[in-house]
């Protein structure tokens, strides 16, 4: 039989396989995170009719005479180029811009995917809603009062507990900065109520006790008569209420015996020192820290049977600078900056995912707290991954071991929430390959037809 018959058959068979791959690509043109396949051919073994001969003194060298026996599929590759990103606006949809794979688990088996169309089940677990596979990452933990994520630990299921309560936190530090107008008049001994209002700068802030109950922290500033660049500050928590909270303030770690202190400024309008009623004075440099406290109404007595008091630090800023501190300039009195770290009890209402994959919970009390972080996997040879269906891959002998870490580490891409990665199939390329494949298939068929005709010619010689 003619060798060309079998060459034609191999050509048709392998072009059919290439057409199968193209058809699968076209079918998945709108599949989230799909990566197109590509078929490469190589020639089959060749039959040697005569070997090569080296040149000698009489004649030159002769090349070998070989007849190829057809075509063979060299590889069917998965092309992991970046797909376009589609905006969805859904906060559980996440795409990877760059290399890397999301890590999923089903039982004890680990899968990898580029399709980040995730959702939250009724237990709060972040999953692939199409198959229930659980998204892997690291949950945040409370360590010494801080929320920390240990990305070097073993990955775990990510849980986003919508509706979960967060405990109230009492205020521990109040950072305060303002400008006191140097032009403000001194308060006369016989001043009336209108004069007091005109000569006093009053600021009100909100602080929280251990129950999460909100209290008003009021500080009144007035110039000390007869003394340049000196102001008296009076501190009160919940002023004007029926119950006196017995507010006290002092320099250092002592809350003092009264609720007033003296603020001194230098000739440049910068904070110079603070003196409490006991005569304690702050140092010449560094932060000005005062200890304030007040009675917590409604709290159980302490171990000594005394009224429970809530103590917090009042940070007035740094001596000798105008940045984030109290100043005295000839400008209108203003509160330039204020913040405190207490809050009431709240419920987890929403969450967001940043480029590092950190999931931040947004609570009803305005607090934002880290919940966890998405894990990404990288491979030495991502083309060696085996497809496992449902837009997932599994590790193979030639992919290398999964290197799991956060985004941006060891070449991994960044995460973009509210988007999905589209298929990287280009229909223009696929239809062009389809035409080329069809012509290759037809050429193989033509080879068989021509070989058949030649055999008929040979058989007709006997007639």
UniProtKB/Swiss-Prot annotation:
Protein name: Flagellar hook protein FlgE
Cellular component terms per the entry's GO annotation: bacterial-type flagellum basal body; bacterial-type flagellum hook; cytosol
Pfam families to which the protein is assigned, alphabetical: Flg_bb_rod (PF00460), Flg_bbr_C (PF06429), FlgE_D2 (PF07559), LlgE_F_G_D1 (PF22692)
Subcellular location as annotated: Bacterial flagellum basal body
InterPro entries named in the record: Falgellar_hook_FlgE_sf, Flag_bb_rod_N, Flagellar_basal_body_rod_CS, Flagellar_FlgE/F/G, Flg_bb/hook_C_dom, FlgE/F/G-like, FlgE_D2, LlgE_F_G-like_D1
Family statement drawn from the similarity comment of this UniProt entry: Belongs to the flagella basal body rod proteins family.
Major subcellular location class: other
Keywords, sorted A to Z: Bacterial flagellum
Domain of life: Bacteria
Any GO BP: bacterial-type flagellum-dependent swarming motility
């Amino acid at each position: 039989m003619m060798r060309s018959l079998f060459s034609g058959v191999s050509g048709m068979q392998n072009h059919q396989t290439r057409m199968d791959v193209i058809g699968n690509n076209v079918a998945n043109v709108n599949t989230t995170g799909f990566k197109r396949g590509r078929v490469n051919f190589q020639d089959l073994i060749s039959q040697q009719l005569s070997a090569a001969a080296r040149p000698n003194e009489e004649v030159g060298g002769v090349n070998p005479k070989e007849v190829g026996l057809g075509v063979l599929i060299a590889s069917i590759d998965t092309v992991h180029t970046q797909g376009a990103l589609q905006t969805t606006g859904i906060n559980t949809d996440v795409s990877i811009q760059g290399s890397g794979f999301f890590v999923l688990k089903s039982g004890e088996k680990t899968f990898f995917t580029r399709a980040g169309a995730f959702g939250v089940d009724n237990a709060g677990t972040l999953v692939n809603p199409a198959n229930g596979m659980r998204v892997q990452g690291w949950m945040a933990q409370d360590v010494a009062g801080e929320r920390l994520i240990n990305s070097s630990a073993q990955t775990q299921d990510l849980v986003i507990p919508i509706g979960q309560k967060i405990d109230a936190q009492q205020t521990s530090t109040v950072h305060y900065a303002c400008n006191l107008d140097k032009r403000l008049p001194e308060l006369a001994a016989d001043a009336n109520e209108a004069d007091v209002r005109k000569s006093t700068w009053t600021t009100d802030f909100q602080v929280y006790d251990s129950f999460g109950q909100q209290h008003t922290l009021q500080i009144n500033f007035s110039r000390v008569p007869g003394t340049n660049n000196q102001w008296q500050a009076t501190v009160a928590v919940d002023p004007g209420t029926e119950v006196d909270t017995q507010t006290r303030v002092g320099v250092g770690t002592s809350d003092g015996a009264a609720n007033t202190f003296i603020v001194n400024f230098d000739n440049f309008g910068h904070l110079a020192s603070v003196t409490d009623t006991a005569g304690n004075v702050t140092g010449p440099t560094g932060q000005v820290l005062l200890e304030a406290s007040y009675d917590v109404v409604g709290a159980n007595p302490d171990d000594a049977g005394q009224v429970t008091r809530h103590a917090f630090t009042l940070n007035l800023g740094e001596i000798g600078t105008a940045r984030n501190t109290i100043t005295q300039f000839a400008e209108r009195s203003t509160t330039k900056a204020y913040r405190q770290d207490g809050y009431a009890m709240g419920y987890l209402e929403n969450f967001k995912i940043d480029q590092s994959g950190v999931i931040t919970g947004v609570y009803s009390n305005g607090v934002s707290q880290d919940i966890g972080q998405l894990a990404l996997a990288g491979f030495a040879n991502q083309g060696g991954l085996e497809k496992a269906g449902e837009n997932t891959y599994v590790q193979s002998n030639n992919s290398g071991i999964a290197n799991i870490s956060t985004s941006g580490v060891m070449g991994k891409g960044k995460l973009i929430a509210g988007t999905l990665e589209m298929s990287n199939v280009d229909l223009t390329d696929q239809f062009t390959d389809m035409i080329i494949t069809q012509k290759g298939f037809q050429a193989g068929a033509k080879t068989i037809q021509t070989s058949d005709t030649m055999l008929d010619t040979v058989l007709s010689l006997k007639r």
